[in-house]
Design a protein with these regions (language model features):
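Active-site-proximal alpha-helix that buttresses catalytic centers in soluble enzyme cores
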Residues: 1-342
Length: 342
């Protein structure tokens, strides 16, 4: 007998702001070969000798700035999304995290124990990147194939320019815009340039020439940069915001390798130096507010902008539990269930 279910997947969070919990989380996160994609021996050395001795304390302090009485903002919001979606669909809905708790392995085992035969895997990443969308899918399929390889699975593809996703972005963001804003900055999570090249199936197109993201190419199906540009273009088109009052940047770089640019922190300082006074910043790569939006942009970003002359930087909240975003997820689940009977 068929039993269907959907699995919402997000990144994850430490269990608390304690340095020990943050260290455990960072160790798991940065041990992922699709995140820190270097030689395994070098990765271990970097973690043990460079990153884990100092970064957990710094990150714990940052997490303490955003932690709520309910816990991690990402986990709290993800649970709200899960509950809202569950209440609007007939199928069972589960929530899992790539790192931390509830772990992918735990949730997959629960899905199996509950007798699910058909699973709709829904990575909550609009854009394809090996360090987010890809690793979430690979980890989930590894757990399924190890435990119940006969389970039938379907996958929500990156939805970076899906009209309903763009509409949800517009619906959630536009109420925060003001007529006297000088600029709307789209700040996407950054990734190393080598990740773009590794995700290019041709190994010859992405970042090989200036127009690589403009001219249509099959490589765009797995090109994070192209997909971020498309989200921005689609948002501008649907919202009606003048393109000349927008900009794009990439945040959260780690280590010294070249990452996608321009870098958000550099851009915020430049905007202040150039006399731009009032900006809004939205982060479309994130569907839920988290450390990278609340602290990195809403706190540190404000300081970076103001220290060079900027006056007002406001973080535009992510879609979080906005009805249009919840409707997007509900509709995708319903469409999937309908496809099973066709």
């Amino acid at each position: 007998m068929r039993k269907t279910a959907a699995l919402l997947l997000n990144l994850g969070s430490p269990d608390s702001t304690k340095v020990t919990d943050v260290r455990k989380y960072l160790d798991e996160f940065l041990s992922d070969e699709r995140v820190l994609d270097v030689n395994p021996v070098l990765r271990k050395l970097l973690l043990k000798l460079v990153i884990l001795p100092r970064r957990p304390k710094e990150s714990a302090e940052a997490y303490s700035e955003v932690w709520t009485d309910e816990g991690s903002p990402l986990i709290v919001t993800s649970k709200k999304q899960h509950n809202l979606v569950s209440n609007q669909v007939e199928t069972s809905v589960y929530l899992g995290m790539r790192y931390g708790s509830p772990s992918t392995a735990e949730v997959v085992q629960q899905i199996i124990d509950d007798g699910v035969t058909d699973l709709f895997i829904m990575p909550l990443y609009p854009h394809y990147a090996m360090s987010s969308y890809e690793t979430a899918v690979v980890k989930t399929m590894e757990e399924i194939n190890t435990r119940k390889p006969e389970m039938k699975t379907s996958l929500l593809q990156p939805f970076y320019k899906d009209d309903d996703y763009i509409q949800a972005l517009v619906d959630s963001a536009m109420p925060h815009m003001e007529d006297d804003d000088d600029l709307l900055l789209f700040s996407y999570h950054g990734i190393p340039e080598r990740h773009i090249r590794k995700s290019d199936p041709s190994h010859a197109h992405c970042l090989a020439r200036p127009d690589c993201c403009v001219n249509p190419n099959p490589c765009h199906a797995t090109c994070y940069k192209h997909q971020c540009l498309e989200t921005t273009r689609s948002f501008i088109e649907k919202s009606g915001i003048p393109e000349e009052k927008t900009a794009i940047s990439f945040q959260s770089r780690l280590l010294r390798d070249p990452w996608l640019g321009p870098y958000t922190d550099f851009e915020l300082k430049r905007f202040g130096e150039e006399g731009i006074k009032k900006i809004k910043v939205m982060c479309p790569a994130f569907v839920s507010d988290c450390l990278e939006t609340i602290e990195e942009i809403g706190m540190t970003g404000v300081e970076q902008f103001q220290e060079t002359g900027g006056e007002s930087l406001s973080l535009v909240p992510c879609m979080n539990d906005h009805p249009s975003w919840i409707n997007f997820l509900v509709n995708r689940i319903n469409q999937w269930e309908k496809s099973l009977t066709e």
